[in-house]
Amino acid sequence: EHNPSQITTAAIAGRMHLTQGALFRHFASKEAVWEAVLAWVAERLLARVDQATRDVASPLAALEAAFLAHVEFVVLYPGVPRMLFGELQRAEDTAAKRTVRQLLAHYGERLAGLVEAGKAAGELTAEVGTDAAVAHFIGTVQGLVMQSLLAGDPRRMRAGAANAFAIYRRAMASAR
């Protein structure tokens, strides 16, 4: 609804039906609130990706399931990208930034495992660098996010997700 940097602790407390004092009994500062929110985001996004990729028939199908789960997460929680991008613009190294770095590291590990499994199964070309494949995957999601932010409609991500992943698949797939 708002630019995260413009959201006051009074507004946060009001939305949570708390007093500002009650909010500060749980959080030492506004930055601590953002850190907790981003930790919640990280936990939920990774759980959603894990659930989506569990028991999927192949590594490439699991990558697609992860991609679609990530897109759906952003559609359900459209404030998350605004908060992330706002926080990442800050010059100082904040606890929230560290939480985002941890999220990307854990997410990247999951994706790298799927990419390596895809190479081993012959679904993905062996020539593709794993780190590059992971960066391209995350960058493709981020591109959809940026387009949806510009359009002011997070649901646009759903419409573009299948085509975006199809391009990713063609770039990474083994010729077999």
PLM segments and residue spans:
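Amphipathic alpha-helical segments used for helix-helix packing
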Residues: 75-95
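Short, hydrophobic secondary-structure boundary micro-motifs
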Residues: 82-84, 97, 123, 127, ...
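Hydrophobic alpha-helical connector segments
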Residues: 36, 50-80, 130, 134-137
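Helix-turn-helix
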Residues: 1-32, 36
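Amphipathic alpha-helical packing segments from all-alpha helical-bundle domains
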Residues: 43-46, 50, 76, 94-121, ...
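Secondary-structure edge/capping motif, primarily at the C-terminal ends of alpha-helices
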Residues: 52, 88, 148-151
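Amphipathic C-terminal alpha-helical segment
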Residues: 72-76, 113, 117, 137-155, ...
